[in-house]
A protein has these predicted regions:
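Short glycine/proline- and aromatic-enriched beta-strand/turn motifs that initiate or cap beta-hairpins
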Residues: 18-89, 251, 257-259
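Transmembrane beta-strands of outer-membrane beta-barrel pores
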Residues: 31-37, 73-81, 126-134, 166-168, ...
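Transmembrane beta-strands of outer-membrane beta-barrel proteins
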Residues: 23-29, 53, 65-73, 103-105, ...
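Gram-negative (and chloroplast) outer-membrane scaffold detector with strong preference
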Residues: 63-173
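Extracellular loop and loop/strand-boundary signature of outer-membrane beta-barrel proteins
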Residues: 37-47, 83-98, 141-151, 186-201, ...
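N-terminal signal peptide c-region/cleavage motif recognized by signal peptidases
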Residues: 13-17
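Transmembrane beta-barrel domains of outer membrane proteins
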Residues: 56-60, 106-114, 163-167, 210-214, ...
Length: 260
């Protein structure tokens, strides 16, 4: 949390001098409710859920020919609860905590269409998201000690969507929605005694949405963001075969920002 607070403070201090020539420069922060699930053969293997926090900045510029270029950079992190089980063949329930810390960046190219005070902006873009997923040591329900481990995830994805905004009295309301497809997914685990192994789950179509309002320079929005992955291929580690199961993440959150 302290790193996110420092990031938010630095963004706020640097924003005024960087705002010249931009239509949008909005540092923001906020809470999210995060859920991570893994499944195999239709059965839920584990569920992680709880609050995490983010701090980031949005930038945007529109040329005289109505070409819109927009970018976002964000850090996020927090600790959530873990409800899962030990690995087969003797699966035993395990409850522990999981720490997340990561970041993401997105770059979009769009075209602005204006009808009176309302604006519509279809866009396409790319994004990168990386994070560490650190499972803490714990004790299973039968008293067995379970060692934690750390996963390092990297995801590259393409985005396609549209955003729109219009005045509503003294408030300007906005909406954004679209789909994204992960074209690269890597999950790296450092197995004791055998080094790092990277699993490559297959990307599945995922979605995102945002509903916001602005009053003066203040911005507030409700956001949803999802990632979907299909099971990876098997990999042998010291004679045992492992794989990354079908996995999904969902985040519902609030962003509060100030546009310079």
């Amino acid at each position: 949390m302290k790193y996110l607070a420092v990031a938010a403070l630095l963004l706020g201090c640097a924003a005024p001098s960087a705002a010249a020539g931009l239509e949008e420069l909005t540092p923001y922060f906020g809470p999210q409710y995060f859920t991570w699930k893994e499944r195999n053969g239709g059965k839920t293997l584990l569920k992680e859920h709880g609050p995490i926090f983010c701090a980031g900045v949005r930038l945007g510029s529109v040329t005289s020919s109505s070409i819109a270029v927009r970018a976002r950079a964000e850090l996020f992190g927090g600790e959530v609860s873990y409800e899962g089980q030990t690995q087969a063949p003797e699966s035993v329930p395990v409850d522990t905590r999981v720490s997340y810390f990561g970041g993401k960046g997105e770059l979009d190219l769009g075209y602005r269409l204006e009808t009176g005070p309302a604006r519509l902006e279809p866009f396409a873009g790319v994004g990168y998201q990386g994070w560490f997923r650190d499972l803490q040591d714990s004790t299973a329900s039968d008293g067995t000690s379970v060692s934690g481990y750390t996963e390092g995830w990297q995801v590259g994805y393409a985005r396609l969507g549209a955003r729109a905004d219009a005045p509503l009295g003294r408030v300007r309301v906005s909406a954004e929605a679209g789909a994204k497809y992960p074209f690269y997914v890597g999950n790296t685990i450092d197995f004791s005694g055998s080094g790092k192994t990277t699993f490559h789950p297959k990307g599945r179509m995922s979605g995102f949405a945002e509903l916001g309002a602005g009053y003066g320079n203040f911005r507030a929005s409700l956001v949803f963001d999802a990632l979907r992955f299909a099971r990876s291929d098997l990999k042998s580690v010291q004679g045992t075969y492992y794989f990354q199961p079908d996995s999904s993440s969902d985040s519902f959150g609030l962003r509060l920002g100030w546009n310079f």
